[in-house]
């Protein structure tokens, strides 16, 4: 049996963890909204048309913030279309996903849904095809108390109190040629700066997220972030990162090593932010918003054919990845990587939340169930609050097709305000269990509380509506601090010690 060791000291920390690290994302795309979170004709719909079964699952994830309404969708979106009486809202073509948007679920509905889901709104504005005044007006509509045309219109539309939305995305993936109104870095940086400036003039308490490059494969990656920040540094608070991984070639070892790339991606963008900080002689630190991250590849070929040949419609089956057990391991490894970079990654949005590359799936007029990736996200959101500890990992290493010196075991650790310690660990070895020796220093008396394990002998095992519990955590005995414990082969582990 392989051996590994994890050394932790309560005085060696990375950073307090921003609670928004465990956010998610709802876009007007596919069935995320219509027949996802919103289905008025469903037998479990509430008085506003929100599916209660979906709300129950979302609450279990305990997501603190949900990004909305896009995504690529937002670059052609007119926010005013989504307010007022539903029967008067216009139907529009959504060029991003070649669908028809009825706007029967809009801004007020999402704010109400977020309250019922015990989450907050992270609202994205359109900087592709709209202008700076629109940015001002939507903040005024949402956050200004009363006494202006836009704030009084919100009141007329049924919301006396301001929505008080604190987090705002300045567009989406504006370097991408697929984006409606794509920009050069200079064009976008200037526009983002002016938009953020007037938005903060309306409400000085808000924070803004500038678009980073759409990915490391973009030809302007790095130079994009630098130029955008040179133009907008003083008025933005975060830079966005988007990252998806897949296993199209069925190389599980290489797939599970993908977080080596994620760690480098995070550190590269953080270094660019700090370089601009130095150039500008600024005392302000711009941090990171990893506001799209997940596994995404299962549905891509199907979606390509559907997108090319389908008629215009609403609530089409787009990006409906069915996740398997190895995908859950990778999601767990991504969460571990985010926790170990908690000093710079302050916001995270698992993309997305329902039906569209999502931990939660629904059937129209049918059931709702948790996909495999639901469980690592739920575990991290439940137990990963507090302070990220600096781990010393001693484990064997291996090479894969694209990565070298990949640790056989990866881990992150969190200490909450009560002094309880939670360890998240993944055994990357596909066939052999691993003994983990825990050396917990200066924590005082701790007693074993839980060892939860997500494991399946079949890496391709899936959860479905008819069999929703194929991949589900089990509880194993948790040894005392200092005693070794066993990580099953290919497993996600949550190990807790409490005061």
Question: In which residue ranges do the predicted regions lie?
Answer:
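Active-site His/acidic residue clusters
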Residues: 242-257
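Non-catalytic accessory regions flanking glycosidase/transglycosidase catalytic cores in CAZymes
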Residues: 1-224, 229-238, 262-263, 267-300, ...
């Amino acid at each position: 049996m392989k051996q590994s060791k994890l050394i932790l000291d309560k005085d060696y920390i990375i950073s307090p963890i921003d609670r928004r690290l465990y956010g998610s994302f709802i876009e007007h795309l596919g069935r995320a909204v219509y027949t996802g979170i919103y289905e008025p004709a469903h037998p479990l719909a509430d008085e506003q048309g929100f599916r209660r079964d979906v709300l129950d699952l979302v609450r279990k994830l305990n997501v603190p913030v949900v990004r909305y309404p896009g995504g690529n969708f937002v670059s052609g979106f007119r926010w005013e279309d989504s307010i007022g009486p539903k029967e008067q809202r216009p139907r529009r073509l959504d060029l991003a996903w070649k669908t028809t948007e009825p706007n029967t679920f809009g801004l007020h509905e999402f704010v109400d849904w977020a309250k019922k889901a015990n989450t907050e709104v992270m609202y994205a504005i359109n900087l592709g095809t709209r202008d700076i005044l629109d940015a001002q007006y939507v903040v005024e509509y949402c956050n200004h108390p009363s006494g202006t045309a836009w704030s009084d219109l919100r009141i007329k539309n049924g919301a006396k109190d301001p929505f008080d939305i604190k987090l705002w995305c300045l567009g989406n993936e504006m370097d991408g040629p697929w984006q409606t109104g794509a920009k050069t870095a200079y064009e976008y940086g200037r526009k983002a700066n002016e938009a953020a400036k007037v938005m903060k003039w309306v409400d000085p308490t808000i924070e803004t997220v500038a678009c980073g490059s759409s990915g490391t494969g973009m030809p302007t990656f790095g130079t994009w972030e630098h130029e955008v920040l040179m133009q907008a540094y003083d008025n933005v608070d975060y830079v966005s990162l988007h990252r998806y991984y897949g296993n199209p070639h069925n190389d599980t070892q290489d797939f599970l090593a993908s977080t080596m790339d994620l760690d480098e991606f995070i550190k590269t963008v953080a270094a660019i932010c700090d370089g601009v900080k130095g150039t500008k002689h600024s005392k302000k630190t711009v941090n990171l918003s990893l506001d799209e991250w997940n596994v995404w590849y299962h549905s891509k070929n199907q979606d390509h054919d559907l997108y090319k040949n389908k008629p215009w419609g609403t609530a089409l089956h787009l990006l409906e990845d069915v996740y398997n057990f190895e995908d859950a391991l990778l999601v767990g490894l991504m969460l571990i990587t985010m926790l170990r970079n908690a000093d710079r990654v302050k916001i995270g949005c698992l993309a997305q939340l329902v039906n569209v590359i999502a931990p939660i799936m629904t059937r129209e007029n049918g059931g709702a169930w948790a996909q495999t990736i639901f469980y690592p996200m739920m575990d991290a959101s439940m137990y990963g609050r507090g302070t990220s500890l600096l781990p010393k990992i001693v484990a064997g290493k291996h090479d894969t097709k694209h990565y070298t010196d990949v640790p056989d075991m990866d881990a992150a650790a969190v200490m909450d305000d009560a002094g309880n310690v939670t360890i998240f660990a993944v055994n990357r070895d596909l066939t052999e269990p691993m003994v983990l020796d825990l050396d917990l220093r200066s924590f005082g008396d701790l007693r074993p509380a839980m060892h939860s394990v997500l494991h399946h002998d079949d890496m391709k095992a899936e959860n479905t509506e008819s069999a929703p519990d194929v991949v589900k955590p089990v509880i194993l005995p948790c040894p005392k601090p200092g005693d070794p414990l066993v990580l099953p082969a290919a497993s996600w582990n949550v190990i807790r010690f409490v005061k």
